[in-house]
Amino acid sequence: MMNMQNMMRQAQKLQKQMEQKQADLAAMQFTGKSAQDLVTATFTGDKKLVGIDFKEAVVDPEDVETLQDMTTQAINDALTQIDEATKKTLGAFAGKLPF
Protein backbone atom coordinates (compact mmCIF):
# COMPACT_ATOMS: atom_id res chain seq x y z
CA MET A 1 0.00 0.00 0.00
CA MET A 2 1.23 3.45 -0.91
CA ASN A 3 2.20 5.64 1.99
CA MET A 4 0.75 9.12 2.35
CA GLN A 5 3.93 10.91 1.27
CA ASN A 6 4.12 8.98 -2.01
CA MET A 7 0.45 9.66 -2.68
CA MET A 8 0.99 13.38 -2.12
CA ARG A 9 3.98 13.42 -4.50
CA GLN A 10 2.00 11.59 -7.15
CA ALA A 11 -0.97 13.94 -6.71
CA GLN A 12 1.31 17.00 -7.03
CA LYS A 13 2.89 15.57 -10.17
CA LEU A 14 -0.54 14.95 -11.69
CA GLN A 15 -1.64 18.46 -10.72
CA LYS A 16 1.33 20.00 -12.56
CA GLN A 17 0.64 17.85 -15.63
CA MET A 18 -3.01 18.83 -15.56
CA GLU A 19 -2.19 22.54 -15.23
CA GLN A 20 0.11 22.26 -18.25
CA LYS A 21 -2.61 20.53 -20.27
CA GLN A 22 -5.08 23.26 -19.27
CA ALA A 23 -2.63 25.94 -20.41
CA ASP A 24 -2.06 24.12 -23.70
CA LEU A 25 -5.80 23.86 -24.22
CA ALA A 26 -6.33 27.57 -23.43
CA ALA A 27 -3.72 28.48 -26.06
CA MET A 28 -5.53 26.52 -28.78
CA GLN A 29 -8.16 28.03 -31.05
CA PHE A 30 -11.42 26.41 -32.12
CA THR A 31 -13.52 27.62 -35.03
CA GLY A 32 -17.19 26.77 -35.20
CA LYS A 33 -19.10 27.03 -38.44
CA SER A 34 -22.70 27.49 -39.45
CA ALA A 35 -24.37 25.79 -42.37
CA GLN A 36 -22.41 26.40 -45.58
CA ASP A 37 -19.69 28.12 -43.52
CA LEU A 38 -21.49 31.45 -43.89
CA VAL A 39 -20.70 32.37 -40.29
CA THR A 40 -17.61 31.31 -38.36
CA ALA A 41 -16.82 31.94 -34.70
CA THR A 42 -13.35 31.43 -33.24
CA PHE A 43 -12.72 30.88 -29.54
CA THR A 44 -9.69 30.09 -27.42
CA GLY A 45 -9.71 26.86 -25.46
CA ASP A 46 -10.76 28.77 -22.36
CA LYS A 47 -13.90 29.93 -24.19
CA LYS A 48 -12.94 33.50 -25.04
CA LEU A 49 -14.37 34.75 -28.34
CA VAL A 50 -11.50 36.01 -30.52
CA GLY A 51 -13.25 36.46 -33.84
CA ILE A 52 -16.46 36.19 -35.76
CA ASP A 53 -16.78 36.29 -39.53
CA PHE A 54 -19.85 36.80 -41.70
CA LYS A 55 -19.83 35.98 -45.40
CA GLU A 56 -21.48 38.65 -47.50
CA ALA A 57 -24.19 36.25 -48.65
CA VAL A 58 -25.63 35.97 -45.14
CA VAL A 59 -25.82 39.72 -44.45
CA ASP A 60 -29.33 40.71 -45.48
CA PRO A 61 -31.04 43.61 -43.66
CA GLU A 62 -34.39 42.06 -44.57
CA ASP A 63 -33.49 38.73 -42.91
CA VAL A 64 -31.67 39.39 -39.65
CA GLU A 65 -33.12 36.20 -38.13
CA THR A 66 -31.07 33.96 -40.44
CA LEU A 67 -27.89 35.80 -39.46
CA GLN A 68 -28.76 35.39 -35.79
CA ASP A 69 -29.48 31.68 -36.21
CA MET A 70 -26.24 31.05 -38.11
CA THR A 71 -24.24 33.02 -35.55
CA THR A 72 -25.72 30.93 -32.75
CA GLN A 73 -24.99 27.78 -34.72
CA ALA A 74 -21.33 28.73 -35.26
CA ILE A 75 -20.82 29.69 -31.61
CA ASN A 76 -22.40 26.49 -30.32
CA ASP A 77 -20.29 24.43 -32.73
CA ALA A 78 -17.07 26.02 -31.45
CA LEU A 79 -18.08 25.59 -27.80
CA THR A 80 -18.91 21.92 -28.42
CA GLN A 81 -15.45 21.44 -29.95
CA ILE A 82 -13.86 23.01 -26.87
CA ASP A 83 -15.89 20.81 -24.51
CA GLU A 84 -14.91 17.68 -26.44
CA ALA A 85 -11.22 18.64 -26.49
CA THR A 86 -11.32 19.44 -22.77
CA LYS A 87 -12.94 16.12 -21.96
CA LYS A 88 -10.42 14.26 -24.12
CA THR A 89 -7.42 16.17 -22.75
CA LEU A 90 -8.29 16.36 -19.06
CA GLY A 91 -10.52 13.30 -18.70
CA ALA A 92 -7.47 11.06 -18.76
CA PHE A 93 -6.38 12.45 -15.39
CA ALA A 94 -9.44 11.12 -13.57
CA GLY A 95 -8.17 7.54 -13.73
CA LYS A 96 -4.67 8.46 -12.57
CA LEU A 97 -5.55 9.88 -9.17
CA PRO A 98 -3.75 7.95 -6.40
CA PHE A 99 -6.82 7.71 -4.17
Swiss-Prot record:
Gene3D superfamilies: Nucleoid-associated protein YbaB-like domain (3.30.1310.10). One of its GO terms (molecular function) is DNA binding. GO terms for cellular component: bacterial nucleoid; cytosol. Its main location: cytoplasm. It is found in: Cytoplasm, Nucleoid. The keyword Cytoplasm applies. Keywords: Cytoplasm, DNA-binding. It holds the Pfam family YbaB_DNA_bd. InterPro entries: YbaB-like_sf, YbaB/EbfC. It comes from the Bacteria. Belongs to the YbaB/EbfC family. Binds to DNA and alters its conformation. May be involved in regulation of gene expression, nucleoid organization and DNA protection. NCBIfam families: DNA_YbaB_EbfC. Homodimer. This is Nucleoid-associated protein SpyM50270.
